[in-house]
Amino acid sequence: MQKPAVNIMVKAARSAGNVLLRHINKLETLHVIQKSRMDYASDVDEMAEKVIVKELKRAYPEYGILGEEGGLQGNHRIMWVIDPLDGTSNYLRGFPHYCISIALVENGEPTDAVIFDPLRNELFTASRGAGAILNERKIRVANRKDLNGTMLNTGFSPRERSRAHAQLKCVDALLMQAEDIRRSGSAALDLAYVACGRADAYFEAGIKVWDVAAGMLLVREAGGYVCDFKGADAPRMDDKGPESCQLVAGNIKVAHALQQVIVSSGYGREFDPKR
């Protein structure tokens, strides 16, 4: 039985999903803002976030909000961390891979998570200590023992393009062991896919906390492990934590092996968490 907070999160995510689907055939009418060279937002991002915030605030008016479009509002000790459209570039091009991500964070740690893919009607949920679920089915991370034959997910952050050479060097080293590496354009779905075993691990630098807050909990509750590029604990999700971070996720053996390649290739040294 889901917690009341998760039920509200699911309702909010599904409402936002309806907003995304209603506009998918009229993308040319959307107003698009270029936040940086490779980072975009649109009317539909804002509309979806407003729908989510309205649902959450109605049920829990005392909780704070950290959203991609609206920033931090209110109480940061207990807050919702929202990405109303993770994979905006995909969405705006009609590429069918994007989602809504919502996490409830208490004292810097995610306690509940929802990731919803409206196109596939796939609903990922997790609560701390209660496991991870995909459409009412318990999920687990893959059980590989090392990097050999793994399917890895990554992203090329628009905020870290100057370090692309280091990431490509890391990718080159990983391809000597992994079966393949995917770059899907949605960090939240990348983590959800690690949680359900569709991918073996995920790594990325310069990723925003709202992109990964829900996915981190999903991976942990699916029996996985999450750390930064140095092998330390993943960052806090509050005003004391960084706005962007570096992340490695998978089962503990694969995550550690991946983190070691990141360090040995020099990619970890290239990342500056203060950027």
From Swiss-Prot:
<dbReference type="GO" id="GO:0046854">
    <property type="term" value="P:phosphatidylinositol phosphate biosynthetic process"/>
</dbReference>
<dbReference type="InterPro" id="IPR020550">
    <property type="entry name" value="Inositol_monophosphatase_CS"/>
</dbReference>
<feature type="binding site">
    <location>
        <position position="68"/>
    </location>
    <ligand>
        <name>Mg(2+)</name>
    </ligand>
</feature>
<keyword id="KW-0479">Metal-binding</keyword>
<keyword id="KW-0963">Cytoplasm</keyword>
<dbReference type="InterPro" id="IPR033942">
    <property type="entry name" value="IMPase"/>
</dbReference>
<feature type="binding site">
    <location>
        <position position="211"/>
    </location>
    <ligand>
        <name>substrate</name>
    </ligand>
</feature>
<dbReference type="GO" id="GO:0042254">
    <property type="term" value="P:ribosome biogenesis"/>
</dbReference>
<dbReference type="GO" id="GO:0005737">
    <property type="term" value="C:cytoplasm"/>
</dbReference>
<keyword id="KW-0805">Transcription regulation</keyword>
<feature type="binding site">
    <location>
        <position position="83"/>
    </location>
    <ligand>
        <name>Mg(2+)</name>
    </ligand>
</feature>
<dbReference type="GO" id="GO:0008934">
    <property type="term" value="F:inositol monophosphate 1-phosphatase activity"/>
</dbReference>
<dbReference type="Pfam" id="PF00459">
    <property type="entry name" value="Inositol_P"/>
</dbReference>
<keyword id="KW-0460">Magnesium</keyword>
<feature type="binding site">
    <location>
        <position position="182"/>
    </location>
    <ligand>
        <name>substrate</name>
    </ligand>
</feature>
<dbReference type="GO" id="GO:0003723">
    <property type="term" value="F:RNA binding"/>
</dbReference>
<feature type="binding site">
    <location>
        <position position="68"/>
    </location>
    <ligand>
        <name>substrate</name>
    </ligand>
</feature>
<comment type="subunit">
    <text>Homodimer. The rRNA transcription and antitermination complex (rrnTAC) consists of RNA polymerase (RNAP), NusA, NusB, NusE (rpsJ), NusG, SubB, ribosomal protein S4, DNA and precursor rRNA; S4 is more flexible than other subunits.</text>
</comment>
<dbReference type="GO" id="GO:0031564">
    <property type="term" value="P:transcription antitermination"/>
</dbReference>
<keyword id="KW-0804">Transcription</keyword>
<comment type="function">
    <text>Part of the processive rRNA transcription and antitermination complex (rrnTAC). The complex forms an RNA-chaperone ring around the RNA exit tunnel of RNA polymerase (RNAP). It supports rapid transcription and antitermination of rRNA operons, cotranscriptional rRNA folding, and annealing of distal rRNA regions to allow correct ribosome biogenesis. This subunit may play a central role in organizing the structure.</text>
</comment>
<feature type="binding site">
    <location>
        <position position="85"/>
    </location>
    <ligand>
        <name>Mg(2+)</name>
    </ligand>
</feature>
<keyword id="KW-0690">Ribosome biogenesis</keyword>
<protein>
    <recommendedName>
        <fullName>Nus factor SuhB</fullName>
        <ecNumber>3.1.3.25</ecNumber>
    </recommendedName>
</protein>
<keyword id="KW-0694">RNA-binding</keyword>
<dbReference type="GO" id="GO:0006020">
    <property type="term" value="P:inositol metabolic process"/>
</dbReference>
<keyword id="KW-0889">Transcription antitermination</keyword>
<keyword id="KW-0378">Hydrolase</keyword>
<comment type="similarity">
    <text>Belongs to the inositol monophosphatase superfamily.</text>
</comment>
<dbReference type="InterPro" id="IPR000760">
    <property type="entry name" value="Inositol_monophosphatase-like"/>
</dbReference>
<dbReference type="InterPro" id="IPR020583">
    <property type="entry name" value="Inositol_monoP_metal-BS"/>
</dbReference>
<dbReference type="GO" id="GO:0046872">
    <property type="term" value="F:metal ion binding"/>
</dbReference>
<keyword id="KW-0143">Chaperone</keyword>
<feature type="binding site">
    <location>
        <begin position="85"/>
        <end position="88"/>
    </location>
    <ligand>
        <name>substrate</name>
    </ligand>
</feature>
<dbReference type="GO" id="GO:0007165">
    <property type="term" value="P:signal transduction"/>
</dbReference>
<dbReference type="InterPro" id="IPR022337">
    <property type="entry name" value="Inositol_monophosphatase_SuhB"/>
</dbReference>
